[in-house]
């Protein structure tokens, strides 16, 4: 079809005025976050040498009538009566089902240009259409979107995923066919958001299978594609209420697969960004299904090494849940402590930041449920030899809300934190950490000098007791080593000695 048509057209190409004007445009329908789909530069332009009207007159004799009977796809919507516009729309959709190879930019360049112009015509029509789309239009649209968008990424494409490790800064791989794909995505966004689309009819064609394949595309290496998909997914979630439970379940399965199996996925941040808007729309009281999503999906998402890539979006989702139901705060903190990255200092800094955000909104009752294990962990962070971890833990005392919670529960918290502060004062190598430690000690002293002094006395007593035990243990082993040095290497039966040899045993050996 394409060859028969284009063989009658000159091969020379030039810039089309209309295409150039539209290239700088953008999709006016934003997503839940308001981000439009930006158009990049043109793939090319329509062939020159013949006027557009000449091409339209010729194409009716070249394209088979099976496209849509009596409708030639390159005719402008302005040139057909209103009764035929939807038939022309379907004809143009069928024309756009041709997919081209973009690995060679010079291959089929004229055909690519015609498809691009046709996609722009379709976008303009959806923008301006006021009549309800027929079922034939919806079916043809769904088919065209599927043909152009749905594809499987090759294994080597996924192996360079940015979600595979910590701190990776690899350049993303950009989709060579983007100049067509971006227009297909823009058309899909406008089509789903159009008031002309009846959701009751559309749900049959934008079904579970379509949604799953759309979600699979979020593993694309191209950030432009993921951004478009994020916007479209939000629009589908808002348009088709009947699909909402399925979308939540399908996204949960992606998260499960990522956390517990592959540890690799490019679109986790985008999915979480969509769900941030979804969570903010949850009705109160929260359903048990939604709480399970928090405990079994969002909290375990702190486990992967690549959590830094999507931590901002994840923290937003978690805090949205806590704002909806403050009683969830303590269980979230306990979950974070369960996944605490003891051997990963960078993640520890991130976790401390998220903990502080949660403490901003936590109630006193929920704080009291988790404060002991929480501040034991914070005390360990204060003593960390990694200065960034110690610094971030001490920065928590700059938060007025946290100070208020600590002051109300100082009888439990001071005995946990003061020993860590004293340990820092005596042993830490970093001057900035030492300065922050002194500031926190001064704050505790002003908060409750009697309690602070009592904690210091107890710390000193514990240190003296520990030093005494250490001295006795060292002396015991020195005696044991001395006794062993006078014994022959062979000739005597071995004696089983416990961890701490008794005084009688040592006397016998001597």
Curated annotation (Swiss-Prot):
Q: Taxonomy-wise, where does this protein's organism fall, top ranks first? A: Eukaryota, Viridiplantae, Streptophyta, Embryophyta, Tracheophyta
From the UniProt entry, list the residue stretches annotated as the region Disordered: 1-51
Q: State the conditions that upregulate or repress this gene.
A: Induced by salt stress (at protein level).
Drop me one GO molecular function for this one. Answer: protein phosphatase regulator activity
Keyword tags: Cell membrane, Cytoplasm, Membrane, Phosphoprotein, Stress response
The similarity comment for this entry is: Belongs to the phosphatase 2A regulatory subunit B56 family.
* Protein's UniProt keywords contain DNA damage: no
Q: What does this protein do?
A: B regulatory subunit of phosphatase 2A (PP2A) involved in salt stress response. Under salt stress conditions, required for the catalytic activity of PP2A and the dephosphorylation of SIT1, a negative regulator of salt tolerance. Dephosphorylation of SIT1 turns off salt-induced SIT1 activity directly, which has a positive effect on salt tolerance.
Explain the post-translational modification.
Answer: Phosphorylated at Thr-476, Thr-493, Ser-502 and Thr-508 by SIT1.
Span-the-membrane segments of this chain are: none
Result for mutant: residue 502 to A: Abolishes salt-induced B'KAPPA protein accumulation
Q: What name goes with this protein?
A: Serine/threonine protein phosphatase 2A 57 kDa regulatory subunit B' kappa isoform
Tissue occurrence: Expressed in root stele and epidermal cells.
Phosphothreonine modification sites? Answer: 476, 493, 508
**Gene that specifies this protein:** B'KAPPA
InterPro entries given for it? ARM-like, ARM-type_fold, PP2A_B56
Listed result of changing residue 508 to A? Reduces salt-induced B'KAPPA protein accumulation
Its Gene Ontology cellular component terms are: cytosol; plasma membrane; protein phosphatase type 2A complex
